[in-house]
Amino acid sequence: SMKESTKADWDIIVARYQPFAKELPDRILAHLRLLGGDSGGFAVDRLQHSLLTATLAHKSGEDEEYVVCALLHDIGDTLGSWNHPDVSAAILKPFVSEANHWMVEKHGIFQGYFFFQHVGMDRNMREQFRGHPHFERTARFCEIYDNPAFDPQMECAPLEFFEPMLRKVFSFPRNSIYKNTCEM
């Protein structure tokens, strides 16, 4: 058990953990590919939507971290069908700024501005966050990147284009209690 473990035990565990941790970008890319083929009723599948969102952000000159957040903003769809923004944000949290994390975490509510009224919800639900330092950033993300990225006629970069950016962002955690214990 962990209670009876020793430093020697943890040296072994950490040594075995490091290669696993370094493979995180590979697992993220594999999971992102799972979004392909499922459109959920939209004109594009979830992978194409993610690629379109990231392409729009990249073409607009957003930094690599922001582009990776755009790419992964819906990666939670497969395992978090009822709370995908929370799942996506949890994956990103150790590696991105607080502003980008908040944007991904809240994007579902902000995106609702465009459709909640059609499903019996309050389209102004995002107003509860009015005045938050990241309100405008998140509203902008949904308005100019997430919302338009359902157009099947729009050109998007392939996943391989974003891979170096993703690997860079996920190269080392900056917001984790473990960041100083396991050098990746």
For the regions a protein language model found, what residue spans apply to each?
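Metal-dependent phosphohydrolase cores
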Residues: 1-71, 75-184
